[in-house]
Amino acid sequence: MDRDRIGEYDALVLVSLVWFLGKFVRYLFPPLFESIQEAYGVSNATVGTAFTGFMLVYALLQFPSGAVADRLGPVRVIVAGALVAGAGSLAIVFDAPFAALVAAMVVIGAGTGVHKTVSVRLIARVYPARTGRMLGAHDTLGAMGGVAAPAVVVAVLSAPPALAAVLARLPGADWRAPFLLTGVLAVGLAVATAVRLSGSPAATGPTDADGDDSPEAQEYLRLFRNPRFSAFVLVTVGFSFAHNGLVAFLPLYLSEAADLATSTANLLYSLVFAVTFVQLVTGDLSDRVGRFPVMVAALGLAATALVALVSLPGLGLGAVAAAVVVAAFGLGSHGFQPVRSAYLMELLPERLAGGGLGVVRTLLMGAGALAPGAVGVIADAVGFRPAFALLAGSMGLAAVVAAGLWLTE
């Protein structure tokens, strides 16, 4: 088999594994919010604000990482990010004050924040005719980190005797143990990526900057003069706010507002990510029938599921109904994501693709970063249901604007 082709698939597999680990460590936190609150005696607003700090740093790294990748290629950026995230994860393993936990979360946010913009740019260049399908594969593997994270948390918090004996040897509380696994794997993947992809034409050649013709910052900002581009950014911002708000507090929402057991709530949380394979379908389908029909359907399903989730506590339908609604939200939200990335890569000029995608992801992740803090504050003030109603409105707005773009295409 041709070595360049092996390199292409190596790139897809390795960057997807790094993305899996980035999602895994991000989604370790929400199922651990209750344990963190018990350990430190902090409120919903406090843990939500801490997670907002994590996500804000993540968001702020989107544009710089894309711009640097436009100049230097993606491999160095991906390797550096994995090493930084690994260091932050290892820091959490040790018992420390709450401020130290927040600082480590910020470091992890910085390390994971450089990855997605760079990996989307890389995959779009390697697979120009199958961008939707390959981004679907990439996002599917990444989202499986969200399936694994709550399952690992449940295993650690209700550890059988053999596992409990191992956890007892660790320097910190049991709930910190998953971060040791994350840190070790992050360092290992960073080394594998550096060794396997450095110098690979598939991984570096297509995405390196061309000569000294580096884009200026003003060129990225001029992208927003295109009304359709700006409108689609609004779609992504509305989606991101709703999605990030839900994934930050869904376990607590299900246990407190829907009155489910904590272990049940954490397992239902994993359903959001267990349906991630829909991305393989929606990515490929969008290559065939167009981006907007798929995006509008996915956003509409996610918005409907959020409305149903807000209604569940008043109906008293229990865990089975909650599982159906959570799975529906997962189908809609995951179904949207690879198509969004593919459409953005089509909108962006070739020379601005990395930094341009970084600008958009900074905005959408910035909005998403504000969501956990907003949900936590509203939940403490008036309850979780009004907070989740706000998320439903944000997702509904995204669906309506996307439908308008489709109708005027």
PLM region spans:
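Extracytoplasmic gate region of multi-pass secondary transporters
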Residues: 30, 226-273, 277
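Conserved MFS/SLC helix-loop-helix module at the cytosolic interface between two early adjacent transmembrane helices
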Residues: 60-99
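Helix-to-loop junctions at the C-terminal end of transmembrane segments
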Residues: 61-73, 279-290, 379-380
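Cytoplasmic helix-loop-helix junction between adjacent transmembrane helices
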Residues: 102-144
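Helix-loop-helix hairpin linking two adjacent transmembrane segments in secondary transporters
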Residues: 129, 137-201
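Flexible cytoplasmic inter-helical loops of multi-pass small-molecule transporters
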Residues: 194-218
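C-terminal transmembrane helical hairpin of 12-TM major facilitator-type secondary transporters
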Residues: 289-343
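A late C-terminal transmembrane helix in Major Facilitator Superfamily
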Residues: 345-384, 391
